[in-house]
């Protein structure tokens, strides 16, 4: 087990989270695994409340997501620092998360609750055309549904799962115990007296390479209504935090922030575009461009986007504005324990601290940004009609 301790006096709380990492290729039945994990996490929450009191478990959370090339399952809690609540025993709670005890089975009620919760999350993802289209593009580009909608889960598969599958959860427990485990602790903690503490945290790498390029997939939900297009650009090798900052600034200048170069470009071309936004997907290393337009214009959009990216230019004033927006965005992220804890993986991916990341923004020049955008490559688009 690896323990990542991030000492900070920034918060009056301590956050503790246990994570389980599994290569995507070995996730044979992700729906069943996620249902069990959701049910087990609800059980763990009750165990923690019974052992340490309501304050220790009231902010308990759990999730299952994509983490670069791995499936990440996390459960954790946030509690008041012992300085302000002497009844909380942090050392004992850390050891509880280090040695999690999973339920040997799930009751019918626990199964139903976990399955319905997962179905609701999937439904929200599928009904959001922007999120869904981006996921479909990723799975087409990388040739694996687990990089896209497969990570959400398959609704028909989930509905077909019988509660008897969880009367004996031995195989789920064995699977979780065999995975790479991390214990992440954030707060004013002097030391971590946990068995198996790794003095050096492992590096986070992401070497995924697109297997399909020039993708153009379409799905029709309705013959009426607008189309949502998601175009993807492969950002190549991200060598360090400096490259990460550059692509974040490009993202901001192109479409994420108010002075959108793409929206200006479409307005000048007299195309009926209702919505334009960009997003850098760090897990898939893709710059995504999402556009909502009339169905009759969807063929005109990709060449216009490529034209705008190839002709991209920025000046010092625009870049400084984007830098300030990015600083504010990161400061807001780092201003909550959950936000900072969620960002720890990104910081480890680029081997930097949050202070170094913020300081590195100032060093980027217009020339750096223009040189970097010239290296990204268009890989295709996905369209959802109606």
Curated annotation (Swiss-Prot):
It comes from the Bacteria. It holds the Pfam family Peptidase_M16_C. GO terms for biological process: bacteriocin biosynthetic process. Keywords: Antibiotic biosynthesis, Bacteriocin biosynthesis. Induction: Transcription is highly induced by oxygen limitation and is under dual and independent control of Spo0A-AbrB and ResDE. One of its GO terms (molecular function) is metal ion binding. Involved in the production of the bacteriocin subtilosin. This is Antilisterial bacteriocin subtilosin biosynthesis protein AlbE. It comes from Bacillus subtilis (strain 168). The lineage of its organism: Bacteria, Bacillati, Bacillota, Bacilli, Bacillales. The gene is albE.
């Amino acid at each position: 087990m690896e323990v990542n301790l991030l000492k900070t006096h920034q918060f009056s709380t301590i956050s503790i989270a246990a994570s389980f990492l599994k290569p995507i290729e070995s996730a044979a039945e992700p729906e069943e695994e996620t249902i069990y994990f959701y049910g087990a996490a609800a059980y763990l929450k009750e165990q923690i409340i019974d052992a340490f009191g309501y304050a220790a478990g009231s902010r308990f959370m759990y999730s299952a997501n994509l983490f670069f090339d791995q499936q990440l399952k996390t459960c954790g809690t946030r509690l008041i620092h012992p300085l302000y609540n002497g009844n909380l025993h942090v050392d004992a709670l850390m050891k509880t998360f280090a040695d999690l005890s999973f339920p040997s089975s799930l009751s019918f009620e626990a199964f139903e609750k976990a399955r319905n919760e997962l179905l609701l999350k999937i439904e929200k993802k599928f009904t959001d055309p922007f999120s869904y289209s981006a996921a479909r593009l990723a799975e087409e580009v990388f040739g694996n549904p687990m990089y896209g909608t497969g990570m959400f889960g398959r609704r028909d598969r989930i509905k077909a799962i019988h509660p008897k599958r969880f009367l004996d959860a031995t195989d789920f427990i064995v699977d979780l115990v065999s995975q790479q485990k991390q214990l992440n602790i954030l707060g004013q903690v002097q030391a971590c007296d946990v068995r198996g503490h790794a003095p050096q945290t492992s590096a986070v790498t992401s070497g995924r390479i697109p297997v399909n390029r020039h993708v153009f997939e379409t799905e029709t939900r309705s013959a009426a209504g607008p189309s949502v297009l998601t175009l993807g650009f492969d950002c190549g090798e991200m060598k360090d935090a400096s490259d990460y900052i550059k692509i974040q600034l490009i993202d901001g200048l192109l479409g994420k922030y108010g002075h959108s170069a793409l929206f200006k470009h479409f307005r000048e071309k007299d195309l009926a575009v209702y919505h334009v936004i960009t997003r850098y997907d760090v897990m898939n290393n893709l710059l995504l461009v999402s556009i909502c337009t009339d169905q009759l214009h969807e063929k005109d959009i990709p060449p216009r986007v490529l034209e705008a990216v190839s002709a991209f230019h920025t000046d010092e004033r625009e870049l400084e504005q984007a830098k300030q927006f990015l600083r504010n965005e990161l400061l807001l992220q780092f201003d909550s324990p959950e936000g900072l804890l969620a960002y720890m993986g990104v910081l480890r991916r680029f081997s930097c601290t949050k202070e170094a990341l913020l300081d590195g923004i100032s060093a980027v020049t217009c020339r750096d940004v223009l040189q970097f955008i010239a290296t990204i490559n268009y890989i295709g688009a996905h369209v959802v009609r109606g």
